Each structure stands twice: as C-alpha cells, then as structure tokens.
Amino acid sequence: MTVATSELGIKPQVELYPEIEPYDTRMLDLGDGQQIYVEQCGNPEGKPVIFLHGGPGGGGGTERRRFFDPQAYRIVVIDQRGCGLSTPHIASAQTSADMATNTTWNLVDDCERVRTALGIDTWQVFGGSWGSCLALAYAETHPEAVSELVLRGIF
C-alpha cells in the first residue's frame, strides 16, 4: 500500500533554511601539524549538531549551514583535515601535507576534540557521503556523545 505524504499531513521540506553567518570561527590545533577549521552558527543555546562533509577532500561552502533550523540548532561545521579552510591543505602546492595523519581514526578523534573544546555533552551527528562513514565510525566509538545519527547520501 502506498500512501502519499499529503494524506498523512506531512509536507516535505524542499527548501533549505535561509543563509546565516557563523557567530564563532576558530582553528583547532591538533598537535600534529594539522589545524582544523571550526565554525558555529544558529542558536548558541540550541540543540548541538555537527555537520560532517563529504569527500575526502570536500569542505567549504555555506549550504551546509542551511540544513538546520537556526532558531533550534547550535550548528557546528568543521573542515576535516586537509580540506576547506583547514591547514595544511592537501591540494596546496605551497605545503607538503602529511597524508599519513589523515586517517579515519584521526578524523574520529578530531570530532571528539571539537566536541570537548566546545563544551558539548552530546550532539546530533549528521553526515553526508564520506561524512556518513565518518559519522558511523564516530558513533560506534563515542556512543555516549551521540544523541541522534543522521546519514544522507550514504557512501
């Protein structure tokens, strides 16, 4: 039996939330020559959510802030090691980024460092594409820190 969402009173969200600017941006030093870019948007008192981008090699862009209601969520966005605004960037000719440190388990540890640095007890973990794999690995190793797990475009 197929039931249209309109029959259930469900209106699908087809538009993203309006563009917003971060209220906090920082570089988090990981102690191994890597720094990751971290930003917070939305409601500082809202439900914490971390957005894990695809790639590897993704990052950047303002669209990732727009998946969440900025009135309800404290939106944490990072650029994973070597991506976006994080340094050193893997695609930069001026640097010799050490790819040996760019492992799944280091990325999982990076997420946990961000959570701790921001003073967050638990958060929703939202991953897309490669970020869905990273989200699963994080949730498996830090279940006490994950309130919900959302995976999209599963890689």
Task: Annotate each PLM feature.
Residues D98-N102:
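Alpha-helix capping and helix-loop boundary segments enriched in small/acidic/polar residues
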Residues T2-L16:
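Short, basic/low-complexity N-terminal boundary segments at the transition from targeting/disordered tails
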Residues E39, R113-A117, A137:
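Residue-level signal for well-ordered alpha-helical scaffold segments within enzymatic catalytic domains
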Residues D121-F155:
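Conserved hydrolase catalytic core segment
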Residues W105-W123:
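Conserved acidic catalytic loop of the alpha/beta-hydrolase fold
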Residues L30-I90:
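Conserved HGGG/HGGXW glycine-rich cap/lid loop of the alpha/beta-hydrolase fold
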Residues A91-A97:
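Short glycine/proline- and charge-enriched loop/turn segments
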Residues P12-Q40:
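N-terminal cap/lid segment of alpha/beta-hydrolase-fold proteins
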